[in-house]
Design a protein with these regions (language model features):
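Acidic-residue sensor for enzyme active/binding pockets
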Residues: 111-113, 181, 232, 348
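Hydrophobic alpha-helix position signal
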Residues: 33, 101, 197, 220, ...
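Flexible loop/turn segments at secondary-structure boundaries
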Residues: 20-22, 48-54, 115-121, 176, ...
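Flexible, acidic glycine-rich loops studded with aromatic residues
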Residues: 227-234, 239-245, 249-385
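Generic secondary-structure signature for well-ordered alpha-helical cores
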Residues: 102-103, 164, 168-171, 218-225, ...
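Feature activates predominantly on carbohydrate-active enzymes
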Residues: 1-157, 162-174, 215, 219, ...
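Generic recognition of stable, solvent-exposed alpha-helical segments in well-folded globular domains
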Residues: 25-28, 89-96, 154-161, 207-215, ...
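Active-site neighborhood of glycoside hydrolase catalytic domains
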Residues: 121-131, 135-245, 250-264
């Protein structure tokens, strides 16, 4: 049998910021990925709700934000037990996960979220905001003041400290910098920002965002690492983040297509097809959310990362990736039915060409058989009607 994958990047993301997953659960996910020929693990370690990664350069971050609950730095948002919940990942934990991933042929990309999604970071280092900023920004998740300020020297002192350390921990050499969901009205009333924009001849907030990402990515390049970011890092008209960054298109396919046309390499992860935190049916008892779509098995299977009318874009669209955000996850086992069996469709789309990909009725035979195999391996499957 001769077979080869359509895409080089066949990934799965896991949000360990909203819910802390035990190291054993991450190793278990890597085993599942290997079985399905998925070869990239996007490890989302940091967000508004926690900074899970223990770093020697800023040890207080994980100590103060790793646990959430009454009396903690971050209140008890999300979680599934009485009292403070959470945890952190040590250098030893990282090494164990990387070693196991490597043995399975899987590369690991960590993510640090900037400039937004930084509430936990700012709770510990408030000096990364302009004290004279009168902006009243609120994130789509409802958090106020969750965005670091690129005009503050403390912001760059922090990034110049932590990014080299993170790069040294993860030898794959690809570091995701975030860059999604900048809140409306952010920085608008910051005197320091107004001064910076005048000095750098930046006209819009998007210009400032892209300048910020360029400067942050320069730090990684100096360390010999390659930057990655969400689609917003190149959604303007001024070239974007640059630095050979790998972009992830999440809100739909069009932002990724735009970036691919502009020469960026892109991983497609549109929420309407591969966000596995989305509910699988309209049943109100279904776990999950639905702000992007109801992601059924059909939705996960029936899409093409590359438009038929633009086949030349396949040279820049290097793969696809599933995402499991963890706002609705209360214990590690909840991961099972959110992933299985939809992750099988992810594997199918990432491996097979459009001409070879099976129709839904054909594919369901494989799903039914393979779900039983996974059940024997300890993975609980969502029961499809």
């Amino acid at each position: 049998i001769e077979d080869s994958p359509r895409f080089s990047w066949r990934g799965q993301h896991l949000d360990c910021a909203r819910h802390y997953y035990d190291v054993s659960s991450i190793l278990r996910l890597l085993d599942l990925m290997s079985l399905l020929k998925l070869n990239r693990f996007h490890w989302h370690l940091i967000d508004d709700e926690s900074f899970r990664l223990e770093l020697s350069s800023v040890p207080e971050l994980a100590v103060r934000t790793g646990m959430r609950g009454e009396g903690c730095t971050i209140p008890g948002v999300f979680g599934g037990s009485k009292g403070p919940t959470g945890g952190t990942y040590s250098a030893e934990d990282v090494s164990k996960i990387l070693d196991h991933a490597s043995s399975l042929g899987i590369s690991v990309m960590p993510e640090i979220e900037i400039p937004a999604h930084s509430l936990a970071l700012l709770k510990v280092f408030p000096e990364m905001r302009d004290p004279e900023d009168q902006s009243v920004e609120v994130s789509v998740q409802g958090y106020s003041e969750n965005t670091i300020n690129p005009a503050m020297p403390a912001t760059w002192n922090f990034l110049k400290s932590v990014l080299p350390e993170i790069s040294s921990l993860f030898p794959f050499g690809l570091i995701h910098l975030g860059c999604d969901e900048l809140p409306p009205k952010v920085w608008e009333r910051s005197p320091a920002i107004k001064k910076l924009m005048a000095e750098k001849n930046l006209k819009t907030t998007q210009d400032l965002l892209e300048w910020t990402m360029q400067r942050a990515s320069n730090i990684l390049v100096e360390e010999g690492a390659r930057p990655a970011a969400w689609e917003e890092a190149a959604s303007g008209d001024n070239g974007g983040i640059g630095n050979d960054a790998l972009l992830f298109s999440w809100s739909g396919q069009e932002p990724g297509l735009k970036a691919a046309r502009e020469g960026y390499e892109v991983v497609m992860c549109p929420a309407q097809h591969v966000y596995f935190d989305m509910a699988q049916t309209e049943n109100p008892l279904d776990r999950g959310v639905s702000w992007a779509a109801i992601v059924s098995m059909e939705a996960a299977l029936n899409w093409d990362p590359v438009p038929l009318k633009e086949p030349e874009l396949e040279q820049n669209i290097i793969g696809i990736q599933g995402a499991l955000w963890s706002e609705t996850i209360c214990n590690d086992k909840h991961m099972d039915t959110m992933l299985v069996p939809r992750i099988l469709a992810l594997s199918e789309v990432s491996w097979s060409s459009t001409l070879r990909k099976r129709s839904l009725p054909e594919f369901m035979g494989t799903v039914n058989h393979f779900s039983r195999v996974l059940n024997q391996l300890g993975w609980e499957s969502y029961h499809l009607d």
